Amino acid sequence: MPSLYLASGSPRRRELLTQIGVSFTVLNAQIDETPFDHETPAAYVERLALGKAQAGLSVLAAEQQACVMGADTAVVLDGRILGKPADEADALAMLTALSGREHEVMTAVALSDRHRSETRIVTSRVRFRPIQPHEAQAYWASGEPADKAGGYAIQGLAAIFVEGLQGSYSGVVGLPLCETAELLGHFGIPCWQCLEGDES
């Protein structure tokens, strides 16, 4: 079985892979995440996911059986990518823009080995209830929005803003598990390898 590496510093992605019983090693693979001019959000997340996987593979030059996973998530409102907020004003502007509206969350996952690469893109729709200014300020003060795409974490304190979701909850968090499991299977990596309570 190939050795799986996760080219991501995201604790959410580590937790999600662990949740489905996959054994992996975290790998640091830095790439330039600047969007290209006129690049669509779907093309952007796919390029970054694939770029992370391939950058990770190049770090593991000596390991022939390596398989590297990369992923990237973008919050998209009116066709515009909302990245990680630069500061408090940026975060509050994002939350104000998302307030009372539906937006898209796109996550791409890529797997690469020495012979091939495959990607999947999953788009989900999230609707926020209206967010009051004092709520947005209190949420920023919690520290949670600072390193999150779109300035919020659906699995965290921002759960109280979510009126509805169509699509993949795990995809919104950062790794669509149904599609990820399918990709892993294509590369000969099973889920449920290491389950809690397994005595073997």
From Swiss-Prot:
One of its GO terms (cellular component) is cytoplasm. The active site is at 72 (proton acceptor). It comes from the Bacteria. It catalyses: dTTP + H2O = dTMP + diphosphate + H(+); UTP + H2O = UMP + diphosphate + H(+). GO terms for molecular function: dTTP diphosphatase activity; UTP diphosphatase activity. Its cofactor is a divalent metal cation. Its EC number is 3.6.1.9. It is an enzyme of class 3 (hydrolase). SUPFAM superfamilies: ITPase-like. The record marks 12, 73, 155 as: Important for substrate specificity. GO terms for biological process: nucleotide metabolic process. It is found in: Cytoplasm. InterPro entries: ITPase-like_fam, Maf-like. The keyword Hydrolase applies. It holds the Pfam family Maf. Keywords: Cytoplasm, Hydrolase, Nucleotide metabolism. Disulfide bonds: none annotated. HAMAP family: Maf. Belongs to the Maf family. YhdE subfamily. Nucleoside triphosphate pyrophosphatase that hydrolyzes dTTP and UTP. May have a dual role in cell division arrest and in preventing the incorporation of modified nucleotides into cellular nucleic acids. This is dTTP/UTP pyrophosphatase.
